From Swiss-Prot:
The gene is Esrrb. Changing F425A: Loss of self-renewal in embryonic stem cells in absence of LIF. Does not interact with NCOA3. This is Steroid hormone receptor ERR2. InterPro entries: Est_rcpt/est-rel_rcp (IPR024178), NHR-like_dom_sf (IPR035500), Nucl_hrmn_rcpt_lig-bd (IPR000536), Nuclear_hormone_rcpt_NR3 (IPR050200), Nuclear_hrmn_rcpt (IPR001723), Oest-rel_rcp (IPR027289), Znf_hrmn_rcpt (IPR001628), Znf_NHR/GATA (IPR013088). Residues 93-211 are annotated as: Interaction with NANOG.
Length: 433
């Protein structure tokens, strides 16, 4: 991986590895006076932020996200009321402004989310052409070419590999949209004289569940990579550094993900923050659990960072390993599907134990919507198990207990000053304790 691809922005005082990175969050700025003594940050993700005593700036996910002259910027007092003044994240950090996203492939300005990833029109078209044409590329060098806005055309092989690495989905490309593809497909069916061609086809009835699950699946991370630092010796410091950096990047993605939950954006800004601050660790742990399902007695913190019991013991994470593994075994026994995990993540957010809810009725309405979505999904997909929705909901208390253990563990790491922690992860951690 080149230094250019690893660097998140010239305006940031420090950086972590982001290739591949989670999609941008749509958050404007981070500003909070930390109990641990951090200075107030007044810039956006694209502006260098002041750091904690043991803290680093969270990665800048956007270009041109500065707050100067931004009509959407509000003062902390204007945005929050009473109880939220002590919140670990100021409301201007959330959804007031939509700065420019960066293409995760080449760093150009992203035009939106294409095939599951924030990307520019050029990389979107390149990926589509490659998949539809079933094109194979060969790198003339060592398969490690830098892919930037200026050099993205220099090596198609490395550009395509980076598309896949940051999470672009091959399945998202419609093969029948190749020029002339639909006509060819139709002629082929006609030639087969299938007896079913003349039967009327009625589209399946669309329920609210379909929209909810589609929204959640559409913004779900496909692959997550930790990319452990090579300059730190193996041991507890390397493991903790890797996991803290990973959590910080996941949090940026998580906040963007939450905006796509039907009903969540309509909550007050204060309630959005309260739910996120309360449930973020539960959501991250559900991600670990889902990635760990294919393995036996191992935890997949990321695609390239998998720990067994012995590794966990050596780096001081044995208690956390056992707690999360208990959840993995429970979900394995239930044979939980991806769609169910997506709904459970949303439910974990909505069922937060936060005491700082401003509009309880609106939050309860969101809870009811998601409970109904889970029940509808089970009725339509697992109708042979009438009690399945209830069994899944009964896993949430254990999830909350496990998340509490994880928060306490990493907060103790923070107090010991063992490893540097990026600003977003650190502030969410402090808000939870």
């Amino acid at each position: 991986m080149s230094s250019e691809d690893r660097h998140l922005g010239s305006s940031c005082g420090s950086f972590i590895k982001t290739e591949p990175s989670s999609p941008s969050s749509g958050i404007d700025a981070l500003s909070h006076h930390s109990p641990s003594g951090s200075s107030d940050a007044s810039g956006g993700f694209g502006i260098a932020l002041s750091t904690h005593a043991n803290g680093l700036d969270s990665p800048p996910m956007f270009a041109g996200a500065g707050l100067g002259g931004n009509p959407c910027r509000k003062s902390y007092e204007d945005c929050t009321s009473g109880i939220m003044e002590d919140s670990a994240i100021k409301c201007e950090y959330m959804l007031n402004a939509i700065p420019k996203r960066l293409c995760l492939v080449c760093g150009d300005i992203a035009s939106g989310y294409h095939y599951g990833v924030a990307s520019c029109e050029a990389c979107k078209a390149f990926f589509k052409r490659t998949i539809q044409g079933n094109i194979e590329y060969n790198c003339p060098a060592t398969n490690e070419c830098e892919i930037t806005k200026r050099r993205r055309k220099s090596c198609q092989a490395c550009r395509f590999m980076k598309c896949l690495k940051v999470g672009m989905l091959k399945e998202g490309v419609r093969l029948d949209r190749v020029r002339g593809g639909r006509q060819k497909y139709k002629r082929r069916l006609d030639s087969e004289n299938s007896p079913y061609l003349n039967l009327p086809i009625s589209p399946p009835a669309k329920k609210p569940l379909t929209k909810i699950v589609s929204n959640l699946l559409g913004v779900e991370q496909d692959k997550l990579y930790a990319m452990p630092p090579n300059d730190i010796p193996e041991g507890d410091i390397k493991a903790l550094t890797t996991l803290c950096e990973l959590a910080d990047r996941e949090l940026v993605f998580l906040i963007n993900w939450a905006k796509h939950i039907p009903g969540f954006p309509s909550l007050t800004l204060g309630d959005q923050m309260s739910l996120l601050q309360s449930a973020w660790m539960e959501i991250l742990i559900l991600g670990i659990v889902y990635r760990s399902l294919p393995y036996d007695d191992k935890l997949a913190y990321a695609e390239d960072y998998i720990m067994d019991e012995e590794h966990s013991r050596l780096v001081g994470l044995l208690d956390l390993y056992r707690a999360i593994l208990q959840l993995v075994r429970r979900y394995k026994k239930l044979k939980v599907e991806k769609e169910e995990f997506m709904i459970l993540k949303a439910l974990a957010l909505a069922n937060s134990d936060s005491m700082y809810i401003e509009n309880l009725e609106a939050v309860q309405k969101l809870q009811d919507l998601l409970h109904e979505a889970l029940q509808d999904y089970e009725l339509s997909q697992r109708h042979e198990e009438p009690r399945r929705a209830g069994k899944l909901l009964l896993t949430l208390p254990l999830l909350r207990q496990t998340a509490a253990k994880a928060v306490q563990h990493f907060y103790s790491v923070k107090l010991q000053g063992k490893v540097p922690m990026h600003k977003l992860f650190l502030e969410m951690l402090e808000a939870k304790v």
